[in-house]
């Protein structure tokens, strides 16, 4: 017959705790898999982002004007607020890096337009439908700006124009007295270039001489349209 061995309770409990401690110590941890892993020190800090990236989360920087003379008024228009605010922020940052003192954006009164049109044809022609469109505006003013720098700023904004945003700019250039006399003293070659451009504005082309008018009247199509048998003349 087999005898049952009676073990003391204290010895059994101490053995179980020792096995539990041994099992926990033998478990592998993720940090133990990397050999010679350097321990991070408390003094080390995470690398910071570049200044240009940090500046995106801050308000755009602005330069102070010395005299406060307006050089350009840029008006931005859009039907949505988000693209308008985004492009206004972009325009202010571009003006700062070009050395232009910019002020704004100043909210302007919104433009509200409404239309009433027939809803549909046939049986719905007596019912009407209303449409409404709201235009949001912002104003950015450049003061004490060089005209060439202002034109460069506007060209940069046109190149990188955001969709859904319209622009309207008014510029002022200040020159010395007697600028008209300088224009009169231009060389003949430059005057010819200016006259060539002005010739495309308005009705400056002459009708023609009397011989040209008589030639037009003697055309066959003109006589058939007027029902003339004898060609007309310009003689009195």
UniProtKB/Swiss-Prot annotation:
SMART domains: Ribosomal_S10. Coiled coil: none annotated. It comes from the Eukaryota. Residues 1-24 form a transit peptide. It is found in: Mitochondrion. GO terms for molecular function: structural constituent of ribosome. Gene3D superfamilies: Ribosomal protein S10 domain. Pfam families: Ribosomal_S10. GO terms for biological process: translation. Residues 39-49 have a biased composition (Basic and acidic residues). GO terms for cellular component: mitochondrion; ribonucleoprotein complex; ribosome. Keywords: Mitochondrion, Ribonucleoprotein, Ribosomal protein, Transit peptide. Residues 29-49 are annotated as: Disordered. Part of the mitochondrial small ribosomal subunit. Belongs to the universal ribosomal protein uS10 family. Involved in mitochondrial genome encoded proteins translation. Involved in the binding of tRNA to the ribosomes. HAMAP family: Ribosomal_uS10. This is Small ribosomal subunit protein uS10m. It comes from Gibberella zeae (strain ATCC MYA-4620 / CBS 123657 / FGSC 9075 / NRRL 31084 / PH-1). The gene is RSM10.
């Amino acid at each position: 017959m087999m005898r049952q061995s009676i073990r003391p309770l204290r010895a059994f409990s101490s053995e179980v705790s020792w096995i539990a401690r041994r099992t926990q110590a033998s478990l592998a941890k993720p940090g133990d898999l990397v050999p010679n892993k350097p321990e991070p020190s408390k003094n080390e800090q995470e690398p910071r982002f570049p200044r240009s990236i940090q500046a995106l989360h801050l308000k755009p920087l602005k330069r102070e004007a010395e005299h406060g003379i307006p050089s350009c008024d840029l008006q931005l228009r859009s039907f949505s607020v988000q693209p308008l605010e985004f492009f206004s922020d972009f325009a202010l940052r571009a003006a700062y890096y070009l050395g232009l003192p910019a002020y704004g954006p100043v909210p302007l009164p919104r433009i509200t337009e409404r239309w009433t049109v027939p809803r549909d044809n046939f049986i719905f022609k007596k019912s009407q439908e209303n449409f409404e469109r709201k235009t949001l505006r912002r104003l950015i003013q450049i003061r004490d700006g060089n005209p060439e720098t202002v034109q460069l700023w506007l060209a940069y904004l046109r190149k990188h124009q955001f969709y859904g945003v319209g622009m309207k700019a008014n510029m002022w250039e200040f020159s010395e007295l007697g600028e008209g006399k300088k224009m009169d003293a231009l060389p003949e070659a430059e005057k010819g270039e200016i006259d060539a451009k002005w010739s495309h504005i308005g009705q400056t082309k002459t009708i023609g001489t009397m011989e040209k008018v008589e030639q037009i009247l003697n055309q066959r199509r003109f006589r058939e349209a007027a029902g003339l048998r004898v060609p007309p003349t310009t003689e009195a």
